[in-house]
Amino acid sequence: MAKITGEEDFVYVWTLGVEGLGDGSDKLVTVDARKDSPSFGKPIRSASVGGRHEAHHGGFTDDRRQFWAAGLSDSKIFIFDVASDPSNPKLVRTIDDFVQKSGGAAGPHGAYALPGRMLIPSLSNKDGTGTAALVEYSNDGDYIATQWLPTDKEQRGARVEKIADGYGYDARVLPRKNVMLSSSFTGIENYMRPLGDVVNDPEAMKKFGQTMVLWDFHARQPKKVLHVPGVPLEIRWAWGPYNNYAFTSTALTSKIWLVYEDERGGWKAKEVADIGDPAKLLVPVDISLSADDKTLFVDTFMDG
């Protein structure tokens, strides 16, 4: 996997709309990252999508000509042209039939570039209960395929370590090993509720993911369901050409987990570090691995 080198001219930030602020809509905000620019470090443009859609994650297509941004509440996906004028992105397409075309997946979580395609992991199904899928589109926004995550009832050929809960969140690929890894969160019935209500609802707290799925990437076939309790979220594969491992953090138990290839070519998961006291509900979310694979950065949702 060739690294992206150099420095960005602009940074795109997918932002939540706030009622009473501007038009109140979600927006893609452009920040000037040119060091010699008088507006360096400042927002210079915003592209409204109209309405609030629980803006969450986004990502570039493989050719970096488009930026895809997803809304968790109504399952809309917004496609921006960032190539024609990188300083002023334009909304060129809105996908509003994600649930219908995917066969019932809902809550598109992010956008992960594949060659000529975009991979969209969902957080839920249309019923809100959490059974999730990986949905693929062409770079132009045309639906291609849906792959549902394994469950205890429908294991889809996967070997299950303990349970197959079917929850989804992130998905990342290690192409040279033909391996894709997906993680797990919770369904719409939980993530669209106020966090305080969920935490104080014992039944709701039982409905969170504790699995990661190892896939045959080319076949899109789930091979093994790893037991990773505590809600594993973001996945980051190591960069080094011989480093066959990935990290994730668990939101409810505040742990760092390692997913690695053992000496026999099998894949395993183990916890390797504590982030903090889970009783304080730090909720580690995003993680970033440095380009030399030596430093892992973790941010926490509740205390900044």
Predicted segments with their positions:
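Beta-propeller blade signature
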Residues: 26-33, 131-141, 199-219
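Short loop/turn segments immediately following beta-strands, especially the blade-tip
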Residues: 30-39, 79-89, 138-142, 258-270
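Asp-box/WD-like beta-propeller blade repeats and closely related beta-sheet repeat scaffolds
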Residues: 82-175
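Short coil/turn segments that connect the beta-strands within blades of beta-propeller domains
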Residues: 7-9, 63-65, 115-117, 176-178, ...
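Beta-rich catalytic cores
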Residues: 1, 24, 54-56, 106-107, ...
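Short, conserved, GDST-rich strand-edge loop motifs in beta-rich repeat architectures
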Residues: 6, 12-23, 121-131, 183-207, ...
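Blade-loop segments of beta-propeller domains
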Residues: 40-113
